[in-house]
Amino acid sequence: MSRFLLCSFALVLLYPTAIDLYLVGLPQIASDLNASESQLHIAFSVYLAGMATTMLFAGKIADSVGRKPIAVVGAMIFVLASFLGGMAEQPNTFLIARFCQGIGAGSCYVVAFAILRDTLDDERRAKVLSMLNGITCIIPVIAPVIGHLIMLKFPWPSLFTTMAGMGILVSVLAIFVLKESLPSQQGEEQTTPESHQETFFERFFISRLIITALGVTTILTFVNASPIVVMSMLGFDRGGYSSIMAGTAMISMLISFSAPLALGIFKQRTLMMTSQVLLACAAIVLSAAHFHDGQSHYYVFGLGLICAGFACGFGVAMSQALSPFSQQAGVASSLLGIAQVCSSAFYIWFMGFIGVSALNMLVFILVLGSVISLALILLIPKPVHDTHYEEIPSAT
C-alpha cells in the first residue's frame, strides 16, 4: 500500500510544481525571449489547456491499458517538455513547451487519483486525499523560494532543468516502484450488475463534480487575486505578501493534516458543510472589511478562512466523487480534472474580461460557490445503500 501512496503523491506534485517554480524567473525569461511579461503570463492558461485536453484521453486509456503505462509516458513527456522549455529561444517555443508540460502533468494527475480509487476504501481515501491536499498547498510557497535560491547562482533555464529532474524522479518511481492497480477484471467482458450501474450522468457524481469544480475555482481565484488585494489594496511589499501567503499555506496544511483525525469523529457531510460555511464567512469578512474600511488584519483573516474552508472539505468531496466508480476510475478522475481546470480558467478570464475587480471576483465566487455547494450537499447526500460504491477491486 505504501508504494501506491508514494507514487500517487509524486504524480500529483508535478502539476503544482510546474505552475509555481518558474514564476520568479518570468522577468529574465521575458528579457531573453524578447517578450513582455504579460505575453508570458498566458503560459499559465496554455499549461492548463494542455492538462485539460489530455485528461479525458488519459483517463480512458488508463482504464483500458492500465495506470502504470500512462504514468510512465506522462512523466517522460513532462521531462522532455521541461528540457524544451529550458532551451526555448522564442516565445512560441516556450508556450509549446508549457502546453506539453500540461499534457504530462495532466496524465500523471489523472492516474494518481485513479490509483487511490483502485486501492483505498472510501474512508481511507477521504483521509489520504485530505493529506494530499495539505502537501500540495505548500507547493505555492516552497516552489518560488526554491526558484529564487536556484536563480541566485544559475540562469532561468535551470528552473526547467529542476522540473525535468523532478520528472525523472517520478519516471523512476513509476517504472520501478509503482505496481499496476487496474482491476484485474477490467480487461475482460464486463457483465456484472455493478459495471452497468457506473454512469457519469447520475445526480450524486454530477453534484460532487460541481462542488469540487467550484472549490478549485475559488482557490485559484484566491491565488490570482491575492497579489492585487494584498499588495495593491493593502500596500504590502513582496516580503509582506510572501509572509501572508506562507501563513495561509500553513493554515491549509494544518487543516488538511487534521482532517483525517476529524473524519474519525465527524461524518464526511459535516466536514463538507463546515467547509462551505467557512467560505461563506470569508465572503462576509472580506465584504465587511471593504465596505467599512477595515484594517488589513480583517482582510488577512478573510483570506485565512478561504484556505481553511478549501482544505477542510475538498479531499472529502473528491473522495465522494470517485466512490461510485470501481471500473471507470480513470475517466472519472479525468472528468473531475477537466471540470476543475476549465471552470477555473473560464471564470478568471470572464471576470477579467468584463472588468470585475480582484476583490469582487473573489467575493462573488465565494458566495456563489458556498450557496450552490451547500444546496447540493443538503439535497443530494451520499447514497448508503449501494454496496458497489465501496468496492475495491483486486489489482493485477
Curated annotation (Swiss-Prot):
Cellular component, GO, one term: plasma membrane
One function term, GO molecular function aspect: transmembrane transporter activity
Pfam families for this protein: MFS_1 (PF07690)
Keywords: Cell inner membrane, Cell membrane, Membrane, Transmembrane, Transmembrane helix, Transport
Family: Belongs to the major facilitator superfamily. DHA1 family. MdtL (TC 2.A.1.2.22) subfamily.
Subcellular location, record wording: Cell inner membrane
Name of the protein this chain belongs to: Multidrug resistance protein MdtL
Keyword Cytoplasm: no
Family matches, as PROSITE patterns: MFS, SUGAR_TRANSPORT_1
Cytoplasmic side: 1-3, 63-68, 116-131, 179-209, 267-270, 319-335, 382-396
Membrane-spanning parts: 4-24, 42-62, 69-89, 95-115, 132-152, 158-178, 210-230, 246-266, 271-291, 298-318, 336-356, 361-381
Major location category of this protein: membrane
Membrane association type: Multi-pass membrane protein
UniProt topological domain (Periplasmic) ranges: 25-41, 90-94, 153-157, 231-245, 292-297, 357-360
